[in-house]
């Protein structure tokens, strides 16, 4: 699958790994133009996770990055499990798709032969977008099913978001689930850095999300003391009050409109694009897209950009909301141009392989449950300076939990009967 770096210093120390290898991991990450950092908030264990995989799926120069924001009693375990399993399953799905359909344009040789200069070949473009959408959607569903059957992690009221990206040469394919976010830094006509939000924060109050939830007998409303924070609730209980409309896990809500289907996006990179920031809502709740881009752009040492961004977010939490608990933060910064230091240290590196032959500047493939958003339209965002809340308000009563377990057991018995 490639070289992966997923675990922070604290997690490695928990597992008895000597942190004397810090410099090695730092160099390995930065050789791929990646800066990543996470910091525990004031709510207990750090439930955020992140990962980066170089030479992903066996393709030289291809990279996978992801951040995951866990919630609920076992949110930490869910986020770590998805972090470890998702890249493996996605890599396997890519390999299987290439083996079954060599013309799918997901393998290196086909991609290099693809004509990606024509904007008029819309049918081929749609086919490619559809191929990537299907791969991501199937992989996310497999990971969610893996969680459902996991005997060591109770995911009834625990789950995680995920925002992931695969970079293949000049092409970005992004898959988003929940309210973590991907933001690109590009340059305007005067060479000034500007932010472009590439994902939609999938909150319960988005019209398409709310419609799906209500059609499944779920409920969407905000509590009196949090009028600006819409939440998702069970039909007959004011629980769990989930602050997002899509997530891995949270199986008590999966029959009531919560889905694990990601929205899949595509962007063709240009010479004006500088870097991509993936981050959990601990960042976006206190810093705007513009502020994040400014902080990362101003980092004199790009390899430390993620750490500086997290530290700024923590200071902003304390200054703006002194009575609120600082949230966990996780950031991955993917720099899209080689730095002078990295190009000097690796002069013999091969040119990254050509990639998915998508055309156009920015396109989105919906993974279900939403309407198509045209380029340049406004996107729903996390509430800046307001969403200082837990992702889950309260756990449902035992009756709802037992009901979910009965449905889950029934599904497993049906599957076994069909196999027999």
Swiss-Prot record:
Residues 96-119 are annotated as: Disordered. The keyword Magnesium applies. Residues 106-115 have a biased composition (Basic and acidic residues). GO terms for biological process: regulation of intracellular signal transduction. Keywords: Hydrolase, Magnesium, Manganese, Metal-binding, Protein phosphatase. It is an enzyme of class 3 (hydrolase). It catalyses: O-phospho-L-seryl-[protein] + H2O = L-seryl-[protein] + phosphate; O-phospho-L-threonyl-[protein] + H2O = L-threonyl-[protein] + phosphate. Binds 2 magnesium or manganese ions per subunit. Residues 33-336 form the PPM-type phosphatase domain. Mn(2+) 2 binds at residues 69, 281, 327. Its cofactor is Mg(2+); Mn(2+). Residues 96-105 have a biased composition (Polar residues). Signal peptide: none annotated. InterPro entries: PP2C, PPM-type-like_dom_sf, PPM-type_phosphatase-like_dom. One of its GO terms (molecular function) is protein serine/threonine phosphatase activity. Its EC number is 3.1.3.16. Mn(2+) 1 binds at residues 69-70. Belongs to the PP2C family. This is Probable protein phosphatase 2C 73.
């Amino acid at each position: 699958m490639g070289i992966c770096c997923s675990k922070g210093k604290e997690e490695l120390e928990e597992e008895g790994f000597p942190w004397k290898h810090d410099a090695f991991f730092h160099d390995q990450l930065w050789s791929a133009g990646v800066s990543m950092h996470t910091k525990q908030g004031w709510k207990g264990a750090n439930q955020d996770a992140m990962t980066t995989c170089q030479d992903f799926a066996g393709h030289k120069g291809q990279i996978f990055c992801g951040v995951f924001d866990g919630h609920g009693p076992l949110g930490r375990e869910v986020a770590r499990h998805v972090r470890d399993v998702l890249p493996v399953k996605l890599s396997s799905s890519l390999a299987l798709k290439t083996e079954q359909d060599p013309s799918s344009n997901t393998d290196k040789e086909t991609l290099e032969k693809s004509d990606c200069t024509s904007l008029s070949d819309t049918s081929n473009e749609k086919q490619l977008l559809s191929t990537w959408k299907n791969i991501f959607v199937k992989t996310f569903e497999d990971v969610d099913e893996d969680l459902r059957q996991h005997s060591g992690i109770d995911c009834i009221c625990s789950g995680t978001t995920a925002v992931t990206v695969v970079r293949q040469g000049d092409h970005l394919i992004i898959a988003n689930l929940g309210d973590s976010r991907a933001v690109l830094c590009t340059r305007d006509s005067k060479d000034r850095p500007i932010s472009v939000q590439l994902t939609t924060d999938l909150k319960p109050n988005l019209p398409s999300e709310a419609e799906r939830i209500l059609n499944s007998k779920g409920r969407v409303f905000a509590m009196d003391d949090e009028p600006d924070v819409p939440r998702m609730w069970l039909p007959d209980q004011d629980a769990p009050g989930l602050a997002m409309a899509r997530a891995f896990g949270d199986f008590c809500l999966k029959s009531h409109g919560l889905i694990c289907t990601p929205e899949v996006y595509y962007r063709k990179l240009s010479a004006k694009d500088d870097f991509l920031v993936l981050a959990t809502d601990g960042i976006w709740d206190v810093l705007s897209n513009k502020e994040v881009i400014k902080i990362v752009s101003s980092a004199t040492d790009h390899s430390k950009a993620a750490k500086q961004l997290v530290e700024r977010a923590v200071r902003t939490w304390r200054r703006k909301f002194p009575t609120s608990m600082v949230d966990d933060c996780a950031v991955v910064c993917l720099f899209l141009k080689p730095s002078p230091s990295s190009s000097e240290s690796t002069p013999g590196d091969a040119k990254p392989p050509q990639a998915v032959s998508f055309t156009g500047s920015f396109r989105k493939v919906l993974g279900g449950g939403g309407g198509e958003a045209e380029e340049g339209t406004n996107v729903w965002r996390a509430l800046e300076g307001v969403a200082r809340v837990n992702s889950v308000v309260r756990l449902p009563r035992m009756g709802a939990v037992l009901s979910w377990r009965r449905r889950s057991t029934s599904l497993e018995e049906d599957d076994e009967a069909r196999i027999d």
